Amino acid sequence: MATVYDVPGDLLVERVAQRLKEIPEIKPPEWAPFVKTGRHKERLPEQEDWWYYRVASILRRVYIDGPVGIERLRTYYGGRKNRGHAPERFYKAGGSIIRKALQQLEAAGFIEKVPGKGRVVTPKGRSFLDKIATELKKELEEIIPELKKY
């Protein structure tokens, strides 16, 4: 059985985002169409369903890095801000988006809080991601036969 580590992250996040759309606990908040994802961004996200991709990415990140807290995720999703003539500077991503996404993943049962450490993936969340990774790996092996040795 393949794990999250065995498949490309971008393909996995895309597939997980499609599956998360079917889960009733995961839905964008009413303010989602109007927010930037952090201070370092100039514009809103262009994709209509960007929320599901961010939630899928956060779930993958908790799987890989867990236990992980909001501050570490804010740093991961942050970036450089263009400040005109002043030198560029790193800014963290917005915390509300990450916090709401984590709360929705907790409500769905995919992650849980560990007091004093952060959030970790539950067995249900690990199974969810590993099943999708296994499906994706089988599809990739048909396209790229060299992947069968892994």
From Swiss-Prot:
Annotated InterPro entries: Ribosomal_eS19, Ribosomal_eS19_archaeal, Ribosomal_eS19_CS, WH-like_DNA-bd_sf, WH_DNA-bd_sf
Sections of the chain in a coiled coil: none
Origin: domain of life: Archaea
Keywords (A to Z) from UniProt: Ribonucleoprotein, Ribosomal protein
PROSITE patterns assigned to the protein according to its UniProt record, in alphabetical order: RIBOSOMAL_S19E
GO MF annotation: an example: structural constituent of ribosome
GO annotation, biological process: ribosomal small subunit assembly; translation
GO cellular component: cytosolic small ribosomal subunit
UniProt xrefs under HAMAP family: Ribosomal_eS19
Family: Belongs to the eukaryotic ribosomal protein eS19 family.
Subunit structure: Part of the 30S ribosomal subunit.
Biological role stated in the UniProt entry: May be involved in maturation of the 30S ribosomal subunit.
Name the UniProt record assigns to this protein: Small ribosomal subunit protein eS19
Species per Swiss-Prot/TrEMBL record: Pyrococcus horikoshii (strain ATCC 700860 / DSM 12428 / JCM 9974 / NBRC 100139 / OT-3)
GN (gene name): rps19e
